[in-house]
Amino acid sequence: MLNPDSPQYFKDLSEQLVRYTLKVLKRLDKSEGVDGKYATFINMNTVLQNPNQDGRKLVTRFGQLKGETDAEQKENADIASWFINEYYAERSKVYENSSGIRAQVSKVIANRYLRGILNPDFDKGQRNQIDFDEHLEKGGVICICTAQGMMRDLGKFLGYFIILQLQSAVFRRPGNEDNRRAHFLYIDEFQTYSTPGFSDMLTQGRSYRVASHLATQARAQIAMGGGRDGKNFVELVSTNARNLI
């Protein structure tokens, strides 16, 4: 995760880089009618690091895809051009100024536990076994341990990743408040995974029938992951809490 107090330019650049990378990988998957063959952290690292020009090869293949619409076709061409002419260019400032996100992704695939969990081997028939969209529709119980004692800061990253995945699934739920199945999210040691980005879940989650139960040692600790916005985030958590125990 980038420091919340990083200059806005670096945060915007990193967000753009990640967004473009994900579109490259997910649309390569879609072009072959599969899910998870290209869209893995290993391939994400390949696009970001470009070892032996392998990232450029993936981007070039992506640029040759036929979009489902004219708008998508143009976006594909624009993204491929951005990578080839700006990101992969010799002595690229864009590449230089996005070192933070590359370092974070490298840490993930360097850890043997996360490498196995987050990168199912498509060719061996391995697939992602957690589908939050299906879970929200049909119900059930999912328990996830981030192994803080074993992985330390990478356990925190795993927590961020899982929460963001769930949050995305929540906000694309079909239906309305009357026909969505109710769900309950429990996060222990919330201060470990708290970021201002979770605020949408607190302010809008109830509309999607997802209630959050957050456990922390002290509310002041929640601000630790929020940078300058930390105090405001603590206030937002308190304001949106129905019960404080």
Predicted features, each with a name:
Residues 202-245:
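Conserved ATP-driven motor cores of ASCE-family P-loop NTPases powering translocation/secretion/packaging/pilus
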Residues 1-210:
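P-loop NTPase motor domains
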